[in-house]
């Protein structure tokens, strides 16, 4: 019964069935904002006996305060964010967004979704151009997205960076900075992202670049040093 309900939820949230033969556990890949968390919460409420775990445990039921279990070697029914570490035995399903992990060979999914309520069309166009993906936005509103000169323009909102040399430089100039890794699963209205080079990071550090560019909900200001280095010559 839990498998049937899961398949119904995947269909209702427009997940696409792949050509992989049906097997257990069901592998489900979806971009942030596609409904993965909501699906997990709904199946947890419908079948409270299920053991649902994650490497970054999230809330399952706001009324009871029930959270996902922290992953150990013990078997689970559902594993969220399965690329986060060594997997125990999983019976029913594994969920993940491969774009948020540096994994060259994630499991072949049974179901996928690139439809998002999280990112507007401006953000999806940016992400698709950088990462070569095909994310589609379901949002009607538009966020504010700008490319700023890091040498002449002050940041707005929360300053985010993940490269240590960039973090050190910002701190030397008295600019408070939040490492991208500390913002996992969070969104902030206005974000200023400082990075060395989008082109190089899209090859060598795709996961952290993706996370850095997807923390905002209203405005994203990108400060890319290499894009403006000629201005200092």
From Swiss-Prot:
GO biological process entries: symbiont-mediated suppression of host innate immune response; transport of virus in host, cell to cell
UniProt entry tagged with the keyword RNA-binding: yes
Entry keyword set: Host cytoplasm, Host-virus interaction, Inhibition of host innate immune response by virus, RNA-binding, Suppressor of RNA silencing, Transport, Viral immunoevasion, Viral movement protein
Residue intervals of the (+)RNA virus helicase ATP-binding domain: 1-134
Domain (+)RNA virus helicase C-terminal: 135-233
Record localization: Host cytoplasm
GO MF, any single term: ATP binding
TM segment ranges: none
Superkingdom of source: Viruses
GO cellular component, one term: host cell cytoplasm
Subunit description: Homodimer and homooligomer. Interacts with capsid protein. Interacts with host AGO1; this interaction targets the host protein for degradation, thereby suppressing the antiviral RNA silencing.
Function: Transports viral genome to neighboring plant cells directly through plasmosdesmata, without any budding. The movement protein allows efficient cell to cell propagation, by bypassing the host cell wall barrier. Increases plasmodesma size exclusion limit. Acts as a suppressor of RNA-mediated gene silencing, also known as post-transcriptional gene silencing (PTGS), a mechanism of plant viral defense that limits the accumulation of viral RNAs.
Extra facts: TGBp1, TGBp2 and TGBp3 seem to act together for cell-to-cell propagation. TGBp1 is the main movement protein that physically cross the plasmodesma with the viral genome. TGBp2 and TGBp3 would facilitate TGBp1 function.
Protein name as annotated: Movement and silencing protein TGBp1
Organism: Narcissus mosaic virus
Taxonomic lineage: Viruses, Riboviria, Orthornavirae, Kitrinoviricota, Alsuviricetes
């Amino acid at each position: 019964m839990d498998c049937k309900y899961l398949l119904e939820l995947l269909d209702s949230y427009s997940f696409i069935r792949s050509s992989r033969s049906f097997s257990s556990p069901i592998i489900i890949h979806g971009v942030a904002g596609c409904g993965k968390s909501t699906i997990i919460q709904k199946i947890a409420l419908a079948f409270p006996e299920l053991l649902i775990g994650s490497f970054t445990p999230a809330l399952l039921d706001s009324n009871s305060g029930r959270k996902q279990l922290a992953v150990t070697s013990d078997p689970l029914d559902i594993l969220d964010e399965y690329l986060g570490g060594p997997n125990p035995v999983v019976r029913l399903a594994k969920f993940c967004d491969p774009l948020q992990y540096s994994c060259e060979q994630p499991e072949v999914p049974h179901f996928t979704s690139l439809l998002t309520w999280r990112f507007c069309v401006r953000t999806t166009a940016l992400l698709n151009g950088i990462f070569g993906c095909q994310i589609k936005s379901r949002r009607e509103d538009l966020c504010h997205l700008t490319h700023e000169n890091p040498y002449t323009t002050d940041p707005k909102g929360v300053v985010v960076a993940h490269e240590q040399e960039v973090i050190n430089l910002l701190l030397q100039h008295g600019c408070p900075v939040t490492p991208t890794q500390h913002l996992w699963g969070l969104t902030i209205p206005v974000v200023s992202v400082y990075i060395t080079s989008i082109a190089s990071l899209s090859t060598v550090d795709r996961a952290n670049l993706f996370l850095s560019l997807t923390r905002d909900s209203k405005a994203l200001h990108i400060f890319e040093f290499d894009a403006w280095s000629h201005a200092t010559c």
